[in-house]
Amino acid sequence: MKANAERIEKNTVLLEIEVDAEQLSQAMERAYRKLVKSVSVPGFRRGKTPRPIFERYVGKSALYEEAMDYLVPVAYFKAVEDTGIEPIEKPKVEVVQVEEGKPVLFKATVQVKPEVKLGQYKELELTRPSTEVSGEDVEKELVRLQNRYAKLVTLEEGTVEKGDTAIIDFAGRIDGEPIKGGEGRDYSLEIGSGSFVQGFEEQLVGMAAGETREIDVTFPENYKAEELAGKEAKFTVTVKEIKRKEIAPLDDDFAKDVSEFDTLEELRNDLSNKLKQAAENRAEYQVKMDAVTKAVDNAEVEIPEVMITNQLADMIGTLASRLSSQGLSLEDYLKYTGSTLEDMRASMMPEAERNVKTALVLEAIARAEGIKASDEEVDEEIKKMAAHYQQDPEVVRKMLEKEGQLKFIAEGLVREKTVKFLVENARILEDTNGQANE
């Protein structure tokens, strides 16, 4: 087989492919063996019709069509591999010659990944955020623990305050008519949580247990239930019980109750270490993202529209899958958010374009620096995946190969190594109290 690639436009390549006559002959025989099993010819059992008679019955063109349906994709993908082009869409194929005893000639026109003009990606100046943890940070974390483990205690007297949990009965009306689904009994509502329509919870502040009050609210214009959007409603609310958090004092007993430590000091030290580790992780992530951002900003590339369109479709598909796992369809989500698919595409477009450019630039840097993923690194990644899913590594490998996902493992590793390369070759300043120092 022979293949020649010619760039006819900036991101368009013309492949001229020649497949030898012997391969066509084999493809024709394969086509005959496949078709003869599905076509009944008078006087012969299905699958037993001699080829010359079968060809006369169905027409030789049927065999040519079946043979080319098999031969063209095989030859095309081999040509792509041999020429090293990177297609971004399906090719437009034009058959030039197909005749038994002669080579098959066809052309394939296809858009390919654009060329990237790299800018500066070494010696990037980056600032690592401060990872200092103050005593105040630790105390805030202790307060969060106090609130998390606080007990709700029923008030014998007093009124509702922000942060309290009120047990309420409520019934809503619009123009005197009950709201469908707008009533509840013994509903537990944390005041200030934003669980109800804006203005509802605020109007419960100051109510005592046993008190009933009429409150007025207006549903937002983009409210998920369209029949209520923008309408004014009146709710009758009865507070049946008020519960308030009982905060445990910060002492050794508290430490024992909420952790594996015996003293408050040990708990403080542990929280400090965890906050420090979290801060270091955030700083490392920020440095990586800043390195990628600068390298991408410094590069130039004209992105074909089809790449952005495909990326957009992937992003929407990922969102739809995530919503589906939560029992919600994309259509319902759009309805609840008061937007359309066109609105969603428009809002996602800049991110899609940025994602494509980032991928192209990182690929270009990897090529320029000879960054690759070794077989051993791929094997190690598969072992990690297998351990996570409690599967045999070989079973995971075969599954990835079957689904054509193995190359994405290698691509992910190359991307990680490329980002690491950017950071290792950057000039990193340390941010200490808002001042960047080397």
Curated annotation (Swiss-Prot):
Pfam families linked to this entry: FKBP_C (PF00254), Trigger_C (PF05698), Trigger_N (PF05697)
GO function term, MF aspect, one: ribosome binding
GO biological process, one term: cell division
InterPro entries membership: PPIase_dom_sf (IPR046357), PPIase_FKBP_dom (IPR001179), Trig_fac (IPR005215), Trigger_fac_C (IPR008880), Trigger_fac_C_sf (IPR037041), Trigger_fac_ribosome-bd_bac (IPR008881), Trigger_fac_ribosome-bd_sf (IPR036611), Trigger_fact/SurA_dom_sf (IPR027304)
Main localization (coarse): cytoplasm
Domain PPIase FKBP-type: 163-248
NCBIfam families in the record: tig
Function text: Involved in protein export. Acts as a chaperone by maintaining the newly synthesized protein in an open conformation. Functions as a peptidyl-prolyl cis-trans isomerase.
PANTHER family: TRIGGER FACTOR CHAPERONE AND PEPTIDYL-PROLYL CIS/TRANS ISOMERASE, TRIGGER FACTOR-LIKE PROTEIN TIG, CHLOROPLASTIC
Name of the protein in question: Trigger factor
